[in-house]
Amino acid sequence: MQRLPIEQYSALLAEKQQKLTELLAPFNSPPLDVFASETSHFRMRAEFRIWHEQDDFYHIMFDQKTKQRFRIDQFPIASQLINQMMLALLPLLKQHNILTHRLFQIDYLSTLSNKIIVSLLYHKTLNEEWLQAATQLKQQLIKQGFDVQIIGRANKQKICLQQDFVDEILPVKNQQYIYRQVENSFTQPNATVNCKMLEWAIDCTKNSQGDLLELYCGNGNFSIALAQNFRKVLATEIAKPSVSAAQFNIAANKIDNLHIIRMSAEDFTQAMNGVRAFNRLKGINLQDYQCNTIFVDPPRAGLDMATVKLVQNYERILYISCNPYTLCENLQELTKTHRIEKAALFDQFPYTEHMESGVWLIKKSN
């Protein structure tokens, strides 16, 4: 079992705080709001390769520096539920040769609502015999008290024993939000820190006037929680499974002022600028929206220059970043027109150098 340096957690977080403070200093950022993580069992998903050794097999990971493999029986950064499943699953898999033969990876996705998806990945075609054994495995796990979905994956094959999603329930500001999370789609890995991010975003946008535009909305994680602060919300997302999950989440949370369209941020920028018309915007009149606030949560590469220019047209910008270096590149442009009103560090990834951050920008008065 790996041991976490829990006694060093506060010092490691303070280092990140200092680093991010230094990075944001050229942009006249106010002091950071800092949101700590749980010190163990904070990660809601995990992926392991499977190593076969004679009649035995076990979870492994690879050391990023040495590339050496090491055995994992327990994984203290992963949720308690994932650790319980890791212990329960392997002995049951060993009872079914068809389930272990050419199995090379196991992915786990768990929720605070105590549900879990187990994805078994194979270098072989999955057949009826596999399905029967997997069904038996699922029943054995249910008998042990797990609320579990089993998925088999192989080349150009995906077999769901029931469904490929779990419904998460997140407590945010004395409310509970339901979020459908689809296997193999992006979800925030640290659920408790995600709740803190949502609460910070709600606080930033409190008493907002007008409407909100969100680019890269995923399963609606932010837009659903923020809808309460706006007259209307328009959100874009490119991944089909995420859009479907977002539509479910809108209905499940009884949100009636949020509309999601499936298109890239780049295409949406062209539509907003009137460069060309898009079929996907049929039935949506962009003129109906008075979006004076924009929310962006871009990939690690940050915003491309065309999107930066689009974003600068808005009175208020809420920017969540998973890469402080590309955030700072974008801020070199954004702070020409906007000032940083609030900034935050969210420790999504304890014991690593990764920093999740947020800035709330307000347009400078001329």
Curated annotation (Swiss-Prot):
Biological processes per GO annotation: tRNA methylation
Pfam families noted in UniProt: tRNA_U5-meth_tr (PF05958)
Reaction catalysis annotation: uridine(54) in tRNA + S-adenosyl-L-methionine = 5-methyluridine(54) in tRNA + S-adenosyl-L-homocysteine + H(+); uridine(341) in tmRNA + S-adenosyl-L-methionine = 5-methyluridine(341) in tmRNA + S-adenosyl-L-homocysteine + H(+)
Domain of life: Bacteria
Catalytic residue list: C322, E356
Keyword presence, Disulfide bond: no
UniProt cross-references to SUPFAM superfamilies, sorted A to Z: S-adenosyl-L-methionine-dependent methyltransferases
Swiss-Prot/TrEMBL keywords: Methyltransferase, S-adenosyl-L-methionine, Transferase, tRNA processing
Residues where S-adenosyl-L-methionine binds: Q188, Y216, N221, E237, D297
InterPro entries: MeTrfase_TrmA_AS, MeTrfase_TrmA_CS, SAM-dependent_MTases_sf, TrmA_MeTrfase, U5_MeTrfase_fam
Enzyme Commission no: 2.1.1.-, 2.1.1.35
GO cellular component entries: cytosol
EC class (word): transferase
GO molecular function, one term: rRNA binding
Main function: Dual-specificity methyltransferase that catalyzes the formation of 5-methyluridine at position 54 (m5U54) in all tRNAs, and that of position 341 (m5U341) in tmRNA (transfer-mRNA).
UniProt similarity note: Belongs to the class I-like SAM-binding methyltransferase superfamily. RNA M5U methyltransferase family. TrmA subfamily.
UniProt cross-references to NCBIfam families, sorted A to Z: trmA_only (TIGR02143)
UniProt name for this protein: tRNA/tmRNA (uracil-C(5))-methyltransferase
Organism of origin: Histophilus somni (strain 129Pt) (Haemophilus somnus)
Source organism phylogeny: Bacteria, Pseudomonadati, Pseudomonadota, Gammaproteobacteria, Pasteurellales
